[in-house]
Amino acid sequence: MMCGAPSAVQPATAETQDIADQVRSQLEEKENKKFPVFKAVSFKSQVVAGTNYFIKVHVGDEDFVHLRVFKSLPHENKPLTLSDYQTNKAKHDELSYF
């Protein structure tokens, strides 16, 4: 993977689910709702001064959200940040940079 270029879409891993779980409360607070399901399906990553993760998450029924989560460099010791998100997504919607 080149620095700055997003990776190809990959199936979600246990690490991806952990990242999504760590920002779930941030999303639920911003959307003012609780999601009955929160399962990471796929992701892309982008190496910057840290790592951006673009994660497609199933949130119940036919509903999906796309998350952009920033993970700082290890020596900075900062929590994960929900940088941006997109709601009203479907399973077939492409996971792209936003």
Curated annotation (Swiss-Prot):
InterPro entries named among the record's database cross-references: Cystatin_dom, Cystatin_sf, Prot_inh_cystat_CS, Prot_inh_stefin
Alphabetical list of Pfam families matching this protein: Cystatin
N-acetylmethionine PTM sites in chain numbering: 1
GO cellular component labels: cytosol; nucleus
GO MF annotation terms: cysteine-type endopeptidase inhibitor activity
Keyword Cytoplasm: yes
Chain positions of site Reactive site: 4
Coiled coil: none
Disulphide bridges: none
Localization (cell): Cytoplasm; Nucleus
UniProt short sequence motif Secondary area of contact, positions renumbered to this chain: 46-50
Primary role: This is an intracellular thiol proteinase inhibitor. Tightly binding reversible inhibitor of cathepsins L, H and B.
Similarity field: Belongs to the cystatin family.
Subunit: Able to form dimers stabilized by noncovalent forces.
Name this protein carries in UniProt: Cystatin-B
Protein's organism: Macaca fuscata fuscata
